[in-house]
Regions:
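A common structural junction motif
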Residues: 106-112
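Short S/T/G/P-rich N-terminal loop/turn motif that feeds into the first structured element of a domain
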Residues: 16-86, 91-100, 126-131
Length: 131
């Protein structure tokens, strides 16, 4: 009986490693370069009705500048410190594209909605210099 559990565990681990390798290969095959991430950290939603309008507008504004959502979720587990209520990570090919998106008319409107309906902060993280 014990050997059956060990065999099942070994097969599960091999499957996990194989699936992980395939996923990583798929990401590299896409050739997607990430030069910047936009991080939005929402600690409180003050007006859910207004906030919902942001959720509907945001994807089109991001896609218009070549951005890709990496995470857009309320499901966050705190590790160190208090986890935010909602967290958004958006990848852009360059810092300039992230800045252009943030300065666009559509995103300026979305940022105003976010600031009015939430307690939050957002920032751009440059990845070009990471070695």
């Amino acid at each position: 009986m014990r050997s059956n559990h060990a065999l099942a565990l070994a097969l599960a681990m091999l499957s996990g490693f194989g699936l992980g390798a395939i996923a990583i290969q798929g990401l590299h095959a896409q050739g997607t370069k990430v030069g910047a991430y936009v991080i939005v950290d929402i600690t409180q939603i003050n007006d859910p009705t207004i906030f919902k309008s942001l959720l509907l507008k945001e994807p089109q504004a991001v896609e218009a500048f070549g951005g890709r959502f990496v995470a857009r979720t309320n499901y966050i587990t705190g590790h160190d410190g208090v986890a935010p209520l909602r967290f958004v990570v958006i990848a852009f090919d360059s810092v300039q594209k992230a800045k252009d998106w943030n300065d666009s008319a559509a995103q300026t409107e979305i940022n105003a909605i976010r600031m009015k309906s939430t307690t939050s902060r957002s920032f751009i993280i440059e990845t070009d210099g990471i070695k």
